[in-house]
Curated annotation (Swiss-Prot):
The lineage of its organism: Bacteria, Pseudomonadati, Pseudomonadota, Betaproteobacteria, Burkholderiales. Its EC number is 7.1.1.-. Pfam families: Complex1_49kDa. The gene is nuoD. Belongs to the complex I 49 kDa subunit family. One of its GO terms (molecular function) is quinone binding. GO terms for cellular component: plasma membrane. Keywords: Cell inner membrane, Cell membrane, Membrane, NAD, Quinone, Translocase, Transport, Ubiquinone. This is NADH-quinone oxidoreductase subunit D. NDH-1 shuttles electrons from NADH, via FMN and iron-sulfur (Fe-S) centers, to quinones in the respiratory chain. The immediate electron acceptor for the enzyme in this species is believed to be ubiquinone. Couples the redox reaction to proton translocation (for every two electrons transferred, four hydrogen ions are translocated across the cytoplasmic membrane), and thus conserves the redox energy in a proton gradient. It is found in: Cell inner membrane.
Amino acid sequence: MAEIKNYTLNFGPQHPAAHGVLRLVLELDGEVIQRADPHIGLLHRATEKLAENKTFIQSVPYMDRLDYVSMMVNEHGYVLAIERLLGIDVPERAQYIRVLFDEITRVLNHLMWIGAHALDVGAMAVFLYAFREREDLMDVYEAVSGARMHAAYYRPGGVYRDLPDAMPQYKASKIRNEKALAKMNEARSGSVLDFIDDFFTRFPKCVDEYETLLTDNRIWKQRLVGIGVVSPERALQMGLTGPMLRGSGIAWDLRKKQPYEVYDRMDFDVPVGVNGDCYDRYLVRVEEMRQSIRIAKQCIEWLRKNPGPVMTDNHKVAPPSRVGMKTNMEDLIHHFKLFTEGFHVPEGEAYAAVEHPKGEFGIYLVSDGANKPYRLKIRAPGFAHLASLDEMARGHMIADAVTIIGTQDIVFGEIDR
């Protein structure tokens, strides 16, 4: 009798459903996956090593480029670690702004995820809808930092600047007449806070639209229910965090269990799954978007009533004001020294973790008292999730591997670092 050999298939790295540069070596029995071996490192940029040669402030933009879909939350983990080593307090207003932008970033991430995941499985319309909403949030990023993606908005001691009084307006062009322009700029006549408020007032209807398209859709359920099941015990053993862990029924959320900034004042719920399959993880993330709306609304309400500083008054860390810098020589020298030489951080080590849209994003920082980190270790949530791919995909079809990669919400910037 002829012996049966398993078939080896290379999936990626140039594959539309591989979310970047994933190379999977699949061992197949017919169309059933026996083993999935992810090959990583194709997007390795030595971020941890680069940070050792840059001052503490100069490494903030590197954080944006880790998970390049959830930019500001990466920065948050990094600046929290520095603040713990420095022992400085962040002004209350800056903390609220950070929490607001963490939730904006969570929505940005989940919109990208729901669009890409649905597109991989074969539902194209959701992708277009999700990007329509992402555009508005990208504009908010641009309004506060000048960049649509890599913002570098969070700084040790606070944020780069307070929320501006005006939103960028759409300009007239060949494809937009005056009437269309007026409609597009309708929500942009007020401050950035007004625009964010308007967005989160409209957004629940948008989430309802995605749910109408997907939640009870027969094909969507056939593709997701019972696929990539992870038991609560295995989820903990494999180091899964975030929606991957909560989808298996464990209500672990750093915003509730180990609150940072002002999350302990926020009123929100932690959604958990029941079966630990792809469908449950989908439901958890959709509900997370709804909870982000609640948190953002609470932040907006507080920020409207409480003006104040957004940067610490410790001048060894905080740069002088732009106005002072242009009129006062001492301020100019101070600014120059701060951005060339940087500030010295006391000897010691600190670990700061934030509830990233993908899971627990941790920064372990070791300082030897210099103006640069001695060692920076990045704990990326996607790394543990990708490691669980083999176990989640065994016994499933090739098409289900695409679903499982989608449900893990993988971005290679943070995995390869």
